[in-house]
Amino acid sequence: MYQTRKIGVVGQGHVGAHVANSLLMQGIADELYLCDINEAKVTSEVQDLRDSLSFVPYNTKIVNCYDHYEELACCDVIVNAAGKVALAAGNRDGELFFTTDAARTFAKRIVDAGFDGIFVSISNPCDVVCTELWHLTGYDPKKIIGSGCGLDSARLRTEISKKVGVSPKSIDAYMIGEHGFSQLAAFKAATIAGKNLNELQAENPDKYAFDHMEVEELARKGGYVTYQGKQCTEYAVANSAARVCAAVLHNEHAVLSASTLMTGQSGEEGIFTSLPCVIGAEGVEEVYTLDLSEYELEGFHKSCQHIHDNIAQLDWWDTEAYDAK
């Protein structure tokens, strides 16, 4: 018997609305459940998507849940896109208090209603919100996936591609750590056709030599270049979230850079941050610890510390319970 694929999206701002549209256009879900505290906004988005049904691959059921979050409990995947983009104008940390407060209004309600699927969280600061979802609900951390550095890794591959003339799809390279200014490129582990970038640069410097720091910075700040011209980012992050949803629903066992709970990888634990993960129907199936240079390892620890520092700003957070986990 055919298994209906159901995806919920919490938050219908710039990003949440584009996530819903991307899922619809790619035919990833059979049913979409949209939530937002602004009833007029979510009603408009639902109507707009329904008006598109004649032009998309599959006939998708689109449900307006308003702020009735318990209605999402039937979903296989729930995307958390609650946020306020204006607060993140210069820094993703700008949404810290807004997004963590928002998560407190719905996360436990959804889990208590019987949700047994996968959370995909894209609200910023992504790693803090993911850690919070785990902390608030006691939910299986493998079933909480943050978009994290997934899009940043795509930006990194694009920038490397422009330097070396190889398709970004053929480049295996990752941004890791916090989804923010402290993230870093794991160049020591980056490969093309199974060969390390450093080896390729030594063999053919004319083609493969480039300034690693420059490329890392372009990947790190790519989202802000987009923001400067349109005061939001929407298409790429929406497609990145849809990619994670597809990996879950199709049980792909795909390797993607995502924010997941650290359980000792590279000496870090107790927070969510980005490393390459195997993602399938049960969520995060495996987390890869990369071979990092001393410089990269130090940067990874600093990046993780920034996440801890953000969590410390949340005065409602039960730090004793958090540390006990």
Label every PLM stretch briefly:
Residues F55-I118:
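Rossmann-like NAD(P)-binding element
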